[in-house]
Amino acid sequence: MIPTVSLLGLDFADLTAEQAAAAIAARPGGAPFAYTVTPNADHLVRLARDPALAALYRGAWLKLLDSRVVAGLGRLAGVKVPRVATGSDVTALLLRHHLRPGERVTIIGLRPDWLPELAARHGLAPPMHHDPPMGFDRDPAAFAAAVAFARAHPARFIFLAVGSPRQERLAAAIAAAGATGTGLCIGASLAFLAGAEPRAPLWMRHHGLEWAFRLARDPRRLARRYLLDSPCVVPLLLRERAARGRPAAGR
């Protein structure tokens, strides 16, 4: 039984990245499709505003907190928080420690020219890969093609690397289509692991500053997310603290 901590309407798995990777790896490849989500501050704010999107996250088999900032703010607010297990860390652990010799993974998203470096860096067998077109989630035929690819290319690990909320919508549709395996909604994690995009230094990650590293590299795209939208998680945490009525011991 996976321990959970309820936070902002989601039952988060209270696992380290190592424990989360082991739990994911323990699922048989032929099991009915289930998916993992990795909400960060931006996701949690959007979920509070969009009940339909929140339902997709609640439908995930495993919900992992992807934000040390949210964890720290939650503790300051007196709200119990789960352990942090970032999507990038869990993905790296799966590729490095939980693949069988010659085992192939399925990837939906990620640029095709990044695949050789990803495979070379991590000793992967050639992945089964589908790169849907931009805006595929608004094109019924393209969306259906992505779902069909997941069904036609079963794997123990199916990495959905098309960004939130597209990957969560896709994961729910793949589950409804009767696929098998475990889907991982992991955003840019594979791009980091392929060396196509640099990840923040370890000390910045440990101090909850990965967002600042990414903002400095791409301010035009990320300024609104990190400076305007994500801070809205603070009143959500304070509201949760008030609803619970008393301080909870943080981790």
Describe the predicted segments one by one:
Residues M1-T91:
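N-terminal nucleotide/polyanion-binding subdomain common to many enzyme families
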Residues F33, E103, G178-T182:
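A short helix->loop->beta-strand "cap" motif at the edges of active sites that frequently abuts
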Residues N40-L44, V162-Q167, S189-L190:
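Short glycine-rich anion-binding loops that position phosphate/pyrophosphate groups of nucleotides
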Residues A71-L76, A200-R251:
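A transmembrane-helix-recognition feature enriched in membrane-embedded lipid enzymes
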Residues A71-P154:
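Conserved beta-alpha
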Residues A119, E168-A177:
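Short Gly/Thr/Asp-enriched flexible loops that form oxyanion-binding sites at enzyme active sites
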Residues P132-R138, A179-R217:
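Short, flexible loop segments at boundaries between secondary-structure elements
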Residues A150-S164, T180:
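Proline-aspartate-enriched helix->loop->beta-strand connector
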